[in-house]
Amino acid sequence: MAETIRKSTFEKDFIERTYSSVVSDVTIAFSELVANSWDAGATTVNITLPSKANEKIIIEDNGSGMTDDEFQERWMVIAYNRVAHQGQYIEYTSLQGKAKRLAYGRNGIGRHSMLCFNDQYEVETWRNGTCNKYLISVDGGDSAFSVIEHNIFSREGHGTKLSVKAVKKIPQKKEVKQTLGYRFLFDPEF
């Protein structure tokens, strides 16, 4: 097993027991994951769905991305209070022609939706010319989740890419499309 770099201080199955709907229901999982892109000020979200088990699910956006410090302060905090720390409106990378957009996120739960598909997933997030790539795992010891691998490299632009190998559940394209259409297609800037 890889060395743990960072860890929270909760029981191994804390997320599964506490946030059962986001780690068990595919439609809720995708809704939460795309809501994270919305909250990051993304105008585009690309989703790749697997056709069979063990293929990757990829969700990539052009949102604001995170620095390593922001990742530590936001992603690694259980039940992160988004409104208290970032306000009720989202951050755009460019305000040009953009209306204010209320954030969906409140309780720091949606990021754990990747666990609906596997006990490990990758987060690649970039801004200010630096990309941080993390391998997250729930089997990293006594913590709720851990970063078991962290790589840093150069990358222009801004955004976040989540990827996970579909092992536990395989999302159906029609179901995902319908769920996301109900929640997000009303905004022409998204």
Predicted feature descriptions by range:
Residues W38, A42, V147-F190:
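N-terminal assembly/transducer modules of large multi-domain enzymes
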Residues M1-K161:
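GHKL (Bergerat-fold) ATPase N-terminal catalytic module, capturing the glycine-rich phosphate-binding loop
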